[in-house]
Curated annotation (Swiss-Prot):
Signal peptide: none annotated. PROSITE patterns: RHODANESE_3. The lineage of its organism: Bacteria, Pseudomonadati, Pseudomonadota, Gammaproteobacteria, Alteromonadales. Belongs to the SelU family. The active site is at residue 98. Its EC number is 2.9.1.3. This is tRNA 2-selenouridine synthase. It is an enzyme of class 2 (transferase).
Length: 365
């Protein structure tokens, strides 16, 4: 019997087009890492998979398969098949996979076929697609030349990147804006999910007519998400563009990012009172996170300024009091640190300019 399966040559098309994929692995496998367009509808739950795995090691494949059938039968089996049918009714162009494209994929496909749907499974499964994505990341610097966008904190690098077809937003993929204040409300993805999402973004970028791969100047870690070593090494040798901005514009931008957006986000999630408390805690923790590098005296001064600014914000509904501590943080911490880092990249700098000049330079090159 010929199996209805999708060959490895189709991986790129599936991932670039965000084809819906049903992941038939157990939840514990899915949580460790999956693909951006995948949804978990397991053949076996975690405990069932564990029992079958133990049986396989001790008694072999045939006995393990029998155990699997005995664990997933009757009403349990029907509930799972119904969930699969619902997924593929909503996503008729979807595919399914398990870990290696083996027995779990074939059994899931068979049960779906018995229920009236013939759905292709992905050859090689999660493991082979994951390897394809790892190779995509490792080879990225050889497909299109990298350009690194640097710029002092608050210069608007992210805003700029989001306007350019050449760009891949690493911080957006990591769900973390690159500073002590860079947390997203929803938290960061697992390391594997970060890498998978990065690889898919790179595949999509490669399908554009952009001449370069434009990336923000990042350290090895973006929050807790680590850039893959080969990719990071490529960034370390790439040419650099420096985005320049006035202090006033930087302060306005950071007031919006650190205060307005974060305050609003916490209130939306937690309500007025608890949201404000969480927002105040976020500011305090962000300063505490860099206490060693600030020094105790500078840290205490900033915390006092934040407390005063929060008090004014509460009593007068005025956020401008935050500008003082933001400016001090820039002048005493971020700006000297940036200057030290950019000095080390001096020989790699291709161009410096404000937003308008930078757009023009990229349009011309």
């Amino acid at each position: 019997m010929t199996l209805n399966k999708v060959p490895a040559s189709e991986y790129r098309r599936i991932l670039v087009n965000d084809h819906p994929i049903m992941d038939a692995r157990a939840p514990v496998e899915f949580e460790k890492g999956a693909f951006p367009a995948s949804v978990n509808h397991p053949l076996m739950e975690d405990e069932e998979r564990k029992k079958v795995g133990t049986c396989y090691k001790e008694h072999g494949q045939e006995t393990a398969i029998k155990l699997g059938h005995s664990l997933v039968q009757g009403e349990i089996k029907q509930q799972r098949v119904d969930a699969w049918l619902d997924f593929f009714t909503k996503n008729p162009d979807g595919y399914l996979y398990c870990f290696r494209g083996g027995l779990r994929s074939q059994l899931t496909q068979q049960w779906l076929k018995e229920a009236g749907l013939d759905i292709p499974f992905i050859e090689g499964g999660y493991k082979a697609m994951r390897q394809f994505l790892i190779e995509t990341i490792d080879n990225a610097a050889n497909v299109k030349p990298m350009l690194i966008l640097s710029g002092i904190t608050g210069s608007g690098k992210t805003d700029f990147l989001l306007q350019r077809k050449e760009a891949v937003d690493l911080e957006g993929i990591a769900h973390h804006r690159g500073s002590s204040f860079g947390r997203y409300h929803e938290g960061q993805p697992s390391q594997i999910n970060f890498e998978n999402a990065l690889a898919v973004a790179l595949l999509k970028h490669q399908d554009t007519d952009a001449k370069h791969l434009l990336l923000e100047d990042e350290s090895f870690l973006i929050g807790r998400s680590a850039l893959p070593q080969a990719f990071y090494s490529g960034m370390q040798t790439a040419s650099v563009l420096v985005l320049e901005e006035s202090m006033d514009a930087r302060l306005t931008r950071l007031l919006n990012e650190y205060v307005h957006k974060m305050h609003s986000g916490y209130i939306q999630r937690l309500g007025e009172e608890a949201g404000f408390e969480a927002f105040a805690q976020y500011l305090a923790q962000s300063i505490t996170g860099i206490k060693k590098r600030l020094g105790g005296k500078q840290h205490d001064e900033l915390q006092a300024m934040i407390t005063d600014a929060l008090s004014i914000q509460t009593s007068q509904n005025d956020t401008r009091g935050h500008l003082g501590w933001i400016e001090l943080l820039l002048v005493k911490y971020y700006d000297p640190m940036y200057q030290y880092q950019i000095d080390k990249k001096a020989e790699r700098i291709l161009f410096k300019g404000d937003h308008q000049a930078m757009h023009q330079w990229l349009d011309d090159h």
